[in-house]
UniProtKB/Swiss-Prot annotation:
One of its GO terms (biological process) is pattern recognition receptor signaling pathway. Residues 450-475 have a biased composition (Polar residues). Belongs to the protein kinase superfamily. Ser/Thr protein kinase family. It comes from Arabidopsis thaliana. This is Serine/threonine-protein kinase PBL34. Keywords: ATP-binding, Cell membrane, Kinase, Lipoprotein, Membrane, Myristate, Nucleotide-binding, Phosphoprotein, Plant defense, Serine/threonine-protein kinase, Transferase. The active site is at D275. The keyword Lipid metabolism does not apply. It is a lipid-anchor. It catalyses: L-seryl-[protein] + ATP = O-phospho-L-seryl-[protein] + ADP + H(+); L-threonyl-[protein] + ATP = O-phospho-L-threonyl-[protein] + ADP + H(+). GO terms for cellular component: plasma membrane. The modification Phosphothreonine is found at T131, T306, T310, T315.
Amino acid sequence: MGLDAVKAKGNWKSEKPKETENKNHKKKNGDDNKSRNEEEEEGEASGCWVKFRFMIGCIPSKSDLDASSSSIYGSNCTVTTMESKSANEKSNDQPVGQVSSTTTTSNAESSSSTPVISEELNISSHLRKFTFNDLKLSTRNFRPESLLGEGGFGCVFKGWIEENGTAPVKPGTGLTVAVKTLNPDGLQGHKEWLAEINFLGNLLHPNLVKLVGYCIEDDQRLLVYEFMPRGSLENHLFRRSLPLPWSIRMKIALGAAKGLSFLHEEALKPVIYRDFKTSNILLDADYNAKLSDFGLAKDAPDEGKTHVSTRVMGTYGYAAPEYVMTGHLTSKSDVYSFGVVLLEMLTGRRSMDKNRPNGEHNLVEWARPHLLDKRRFYRLLDPRLEGHFSIKGAQKVTQLAAQCLSRDPKIRPKMSDVVEALKPLPHLKDMASSSYYFQTMQAERLKNGSGRSQGFGSRNGQHQPVFRTLSSPHGSSPYRHQIPSPKPKGATT
């Protein structure tokens, strides 16, 4: 199930149409060039890079690739970068240990847009194999209206297929799916695609997004996922005007915890997720949480070993400090990231937000003094909840977040213990708005002229700096880019 034993070779390239160099070219060549130019004009007319850029970027041009595949329905729109990006691609990402606005590019793995791939696919028997034409028709020819989102590495489209087959069906019927494409301009996207199919294709759990199938046809690589109609947790917490109700937040926290617990303690081969964050938690129609995007997932260390040494990857603000400092990855790194997300759900604040006052940019550092102080914990609560939260539940969440965010990874709880702690919280009815304490506290703050602003976050502004930036328009899966930090000596990827 790992990425190490691999054996399918092919050249992976994407070429833009070339202009005619000689007016006396044969008629056949002239017709070919004319056809390519018509495709370009059609793409520009669409008002979106879907037609032209999609055909040249999202969907690779024909080449000699035999076996490979593409796309991730998760934090990015096509395949995300794992160790590097193609040399000609710009990035807004940054290493996990640094916060800067400088643009960084890494080509540690690939310095060409036509890398030679040599990897092994471990495709599960339950996955459906689609033809490219099936997916083209299911998404209505990849038209802009079907576009769920786009990112630096490709696009995600909404499609409809047979309930138990691969044939396309009329929109609104059959099974709704998300079809993700792979931009072939770099080895890293392919590596993350391999991780996605090798992990998510072999892991089945109610709290993991289901991989329905794949397409490997010439140099076309696409992946097909179950459609998640409510999009990402990030979208609901930070991009919508109506606040997410407390009980729903707790339901989502519990579901996400169950997903991590399965990966760490129940999977046949334990897995470290390595990229747990709000944008990778997708929601179905009933707000059931499912983890998406396994592009950075790693096999847990073998028995007798304490950690995996690897290049630091992920999103700034979520990565555990010991992992950032040493590159030593353990399941407790995921537990720390869970604590950050729990804090985001509690406060309504992003893990990193430079639009906030000095001292409040980093959510964890700002929140630490309040986490274990019963007199100050109320300052953490999302003001948009307006007292519609369980007092006991909020106290339990702050305690749990403090444990998960411990600087000593050995003190952090196992995810199975987190699940047990969260189970009762969605059903608690002791709303703060009806308590004398909360009403008195609110009155005192108003009297002091602090209103909601003291310790409470307003609506968040720009997204935090990341090595993989994210967005989730139209309920689609989020997108991200990432930038690796220097690789530790002897580390693997």
